[in-house]
Amino acid sequence: MPKGGEDVTKRVLFVCSGNIDRSPTAEALLRGRKGFEVKSAGTLAGAPTVASKQLIDWADIIFVMEEKHKEALKLLDENVDRKIVVLGIDDHYLKSDPELTRILKDKLSKHFGKV
């Protein structure tokens, strides 16, 4: 347990299908913020970073873009439900799309304050 004055880092994992657009955009929003260590991954085999049991174990909280991503992670770890938040963001945005950024900021601010 951290002693008074120590920083507590929250490890956050963002997951989408291909780890190309949605999850990297979300990762960029929190990257560099004090108190967060952030990674992103995809559920598809060809993703730059593929979701794994190791990443699930690393994360304190996992934000998935769609329900299907939650189901894919449950195949890797049946107990992952307790860590997952489904954001409900469909796959029709490009990386750093202003609308995607706005939606992510809105949804993430409910968990982390202003993003």
Per-segment meaning from a language model:
Residues M1-V115:
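Short polar/charged helix/loop
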